[in-house]
């Protein structure tokens, strides 16, 4: 009798947990993905951070005419953070593209500095062999 009661409680807990996870997975807000990407960066899980920042960019397309100020800022931040992650991975071409995108969206000193640092890094690196 006790075993059956424990089994029922365990089953209900599992079902409740499953439903919470399912509902939580449907939150496709750009802000959630931006926060998750930042968390992954803090933990050093860069591949997952890339996916999250790219999801922010996918969810807020620039062709969308009614983009809010907050979404515009999130989009610039996602490009900036993606550029930083790409530099950590040594993907300089991708980093420069994202840094330029972030500067185009938010022409701030920090975004400009990032573009210039990546360009300087590319100038200092040895030339790639031509195929």
Q: Could you tell me what each predicted segment is?
A:
Residues 59-72:
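Flexible helix-coil transition and linker loops at the boundaries of alpha-helical arrays
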Residues 27-28, 73:
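Residue signature of alpha-solenoid helical repeat architecture, marking inter-repeat boundaries
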